[in-house]
UniProtKB/Swiss-Prot annotation:
This is Extracellular globin-1. It is found in: Secreted. It comes from the Eukaryota. Belongs to the globin family. It holds the Pfam family Globin. One of its GO terms (molecular function) is iron ion binding.
Amino acid sequence: DCNTLKRFKVKHQWQQVFSGEHHRTEFSLHFWKEFLHDHPDLVSLFKRVQGENIYSPEFQAHGIRVLAGLDSVIGVLDEDDTFTVQLAHLKAQHTERGTKPEYFDLFGTQLFDILGDKLGTHFDQAAWRDCYAVIAAGIKP
């Protein structure tokens, strides 16, 4: 259950790791480096944005865009109507691109690992697990 307290914690913790241009760039690079290292079979999905080179401007921009999408959803976690509209928008984009539902599970696992690295003992994994489950369910094609 992604209740009010969990939503607040997720928003607050996300703000700690993903605010400001430097934090966003650093977080994105760390996330995608680990994600594609753990899932080399998925590099081909990012061919259009030079996924074989996560340091390329094309991939850097794409990586930030993906995480900015997550940022936009987390930012409205406590605004039910806007949250629903944002999820529907992202679902349409991912359906159009043929994104497989299981990719969201892989993404979530990696996200939790990176958040744990960044936040240490302050990471509320239960809050993230419950709220990310709602987010992923709303976006999965």
